[in-house]
Amino acid sequence: TTEIYTLSLHDALPIYKEFEEFRRLFDSSLQSSNSLLSEVLSYIKQRNGKMMRPILALLIAKLFGEINDSTLHAALSLELLHTASLVHDDVVDESDKRRGQSSVNAIYNNKVSVLVGDYMLATSLKHSAMTREITIVDLVACLGQNLSEGEIIQLANINASEFSEEVYYDVIRKKTAALFTASAEAGAISVHASDEMVKNARLFGEMIGIAFQIKDDIFDYYSSDEIGKPTGNDMREGKLTLPALYVLNMFDDEEMRKLALRIRALDASDEDIARFIEYTKVKREIGRAHV
């Protein structure tokens, strides 16, 4: 009964057939005659995520018109760029886990990870050109710049003594939100939506992206195998997210501020991080971040 229900639900989705076509295109784009490259790309394919960004691009395109080849190549270009950025991020963050599984750099090494990420970036640009929409090509290029700039801002903030919510929002607008913004905008552009529709799609994508990142950051305060990352993982990488920033700015606790600075400097133990998480929970600032 469950299987029948699932199939009928899938068939009812407005972009089910187009998404299946996208998945085939995605899989075929991650192939190579080189054995090592093919092996790494296959591993990346096996652990891909929920693909919310291409789904958003397809839904927006369907809302304003009919999904076409330009839409599919735009969605693929953005998903490849997103995936490449994750491969590179794991190298920068020295992370050995991604989506609950071993990261590419943990299985292979940093050199292979960087080169495979570069290969995917080049493939992303290729598919942006296949949209035959110069606006989408420019969109993808600007997205790449934003992702890099967001990562640099985040790295530069590690040594900051202030706990700025403004910097936090600046980072997520240039990283997570930028991906959702570009996906929604590309979907609208691919079906030649009006300027007003493109503008609305862009704003909608940004709001979805910001909300998604805040929710993802909140997950870091709770343990769950389904989330795909251990509790306090962001803090182990020196990142203080919105709940932490709220509690640091709301309460004048010198001991916790010093601990937060040690977390940023990667000088905190697992026990320190667990203590800071518990402090944030007690102060109920996670609930404020939910709102």
Locations of regions flagged by a protein language model:
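Extracellular/surface recognition and adhesion modules
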Residues: 1-4, 291
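All-alpha prenyltransferase/terpene-synthase fold signal
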Residues: 8-290
